[in-house]
Curated annotation (Swiss-Prot):
It comes from Arabidopsis thaliana (Mouse-ear cress). SUPFAM superfamilies: UDP-Glycosyltransferase/glycogen phosphorylase. The keyword NADP does not apply. This is UDP-glycosyltransferase 83A1. GO terms for molecular function: UDP-glycosyltransferase activity. Keywords: Glycosyltransferase, Transferase. It holds the Pfam family UDPGT. It comes from the Eukaryota. Its EC number is 2.4.1.-. UDP-alpha-D-glucose binds at residues 295, 341-343, 358-366, 380-383. Belongs to the UDP-glycosyltransferase family.
């Protein structure tokens, strides 16, 4: 074998498998880009649906499956080709993923391993922590395994605490809540309401039970991994990391490259409206209310109407990202409505004074790392845990209270925004302190930075 072949065989190669929802795909793409810049070859396995959305959002992509930075995109079916609307229903999506994807991933890895005689070996599989089956597939082939948590460490600790919740009589063995109460897993952890546990928030009872059982299975799979990485910051979740000492914080992923000149939009699901950045440049610093609720459209028309009127009542400039929901009609010229925006750039622009958010973890981290106060409207999954961090632990935001209809009324919106954006406000001051904590974690001697370096060195050691 010649020297070039030896070099190819000695090149680390990581296969990355995200859960097929935008909030899970984006941090793993950011992580993949980081690894690629360290000289690691990446194969990123996406569903065909998400693969096509990402490719179509890339400007002038030179090749459909290879996007540079040593990242090769491949795709497999998700089983929802005949019922695409179920991709927006988390429970249905998870059930379909479990039925259709494991065999496809196994076949793909088997082909890749058969083709390594003249290329690179697979050093490690990095899988979303909710895909326990992917970890089991890697184990079947004797491949090193890493679980990646795109959520808060507290969310993972809740999953690890399921047996204790059963023993304490709070839930049944199928996840059904027996006692509605507020609990705290340890001092310093966010308080959690039992009727808002991650699996309980799903409306369909069968989906609740299926997801609960899947979480139990995933816990067993995670125990066999070499690494359990979390897109979080140790200093922001000290208590959670204390309860889960094997969880390794490496967040916030993507911060280092997100604002680099010439950085591609790899990871976007739709082309961004970049005109909004010019609009933000014309606004007074700290004056704009930024409104965005993630990729799952969960807000009904009555809530959209109340929110829109409440925002107009503030008489402040608003940038509203609608996502795949119906466009919002507003009469004020102070309000700019776009379908998708480059969120990291929006939040770092200096114009944003308040982030009205569903409290998805990516949005929570991105707001925190830019020192932005929040107004919180959580709906499901881990969003209630993240809201508790924002409002009760870090104290950088307020929750919006719903009325008897389950709707946040317009006057509540105006009142809370006025409180958050008051001149010399305490929320902005605390948010800037949280920003300092986040920036320290990704600095050269920060915990997240050091953990990333340790992981990269470990990957490279697999081929030496």
């Amino acid at each position: 074998m010649d020297n070039n072949s030896n070099k190819r065989m000695g090149r680390p190669h990581v296969v990355v498998i995200p859960y097929p929802a935008q909030g899970h795909v984006l941090p793993l793409i950011s992580f993949s880009r980081y690894l690629a810049k360290q000289g690691i070859q990446i194969t990123f396995i996406n569903t065909e649906f998400n693969h096509n959305r990402i490719i179509s959002s890339l400007p002038n992509s030179p090749h459909e499956d290879y996007v540079g930075d040593q990242i090769n995109l491949v795709s497999i079916p998700d089983g929802l080709e005949d019922s695409p609307e179920e991709r927006n229903i988390p429970g249905k999506l998870s059930e379909s993923v479990l039925r259709f994807m494991p065999k496809k991933v196994e076949e793909l890895i088997e082909r890749m391993m058969a083709e390594t005689s003249g290329g690179t070996i697979i050093s490690c599989v990095v899988a979303d922590q909710s895909l326990g089956w992917a970890i089991e597939v890697a184990a079947k082939f004797g491949i090193r395994r890493t679980a990646f948590c795109p959520a808060a460490a507290a969310s993972m600790v809740l999953g690890f605490s399921i047996q204790k919740l059963i023993d304490d009589g709070l839930i049944d063995s199928d996840g059904t809540v027996r006692v509605n109460k507020t609990i705290q897993l340890s001092p310093g952890m966010p308080k959690m309401e039992t009727d808002k546990f991650v699996w309980v928030c799903l409306k369909n009872k069968e989906s609740q039970k299926n997801i609960f059982q899947l979480m139990l299975q995933n816990n067993n799979s995670i125990e066999s991994t070499d690494w359990l990485l979390c897109n979080s910051v140790h200093e922001l979740e000290t208590a959670a990391f204390g309860l889960g000492p094997n969880i390794v914080p490496i967040g916030p992923i993507g911060w280092a490259h997100s604002l680099e000149e010439g950085s591609t939009s790899l990871g976007s699901f739709l082309p961004h409206d970049r005109d909004c950045l010019d609009w933000l440049d014309r606004q007074i610093p700290g004056s704009v209310i930024y409104v965005a609720f993630g990729s799952f459209g969960v807000m009904g028309n009555p809530q959209l109407e109340e929110l829109a009127i409440g925002l107009e009542l503030t008489k402040r400039p608003v940038l509203w990202v609608t996502g795949d929901q119906q466009p919002i009609k507003l009469g004020s010229d102070r309000v700019k409505v776009v379908r998708w925006a480059p969120q990291r750039e929006v939040l770092s622009s200096g114009a944003i004074g308040c982030f009205v958010s569903h409290c998805g973890w990516n949005s929570t981290l991105e707001g925190a790392q830019n020192g932005i106060p929040f107004l919180c409207i959580p709906y499901f999954a881990d969003q209630f845990i993240n809201k508790a961090y924002i409002c009760d632990v870090w104290k950088i935001g307020l929750g919006l209270e719903r009325d008897a209809r389950g709707v946040v009324p317009r006057l509540e919106v105006k009142k809370k925004i006025d409180e958050i954006m008051r001149d010399g406000g305490e929320y902005e001051e605390r948010a800037m302190k949280v920003k300092e904590i986040v920036m320290k974690s990704v600095a050269k001697d920060g915990i997240s930075c050091e953990n990333l370096n340790k992981f990269v060195n470990w990957i490279k050691s697999q081929v030496n």
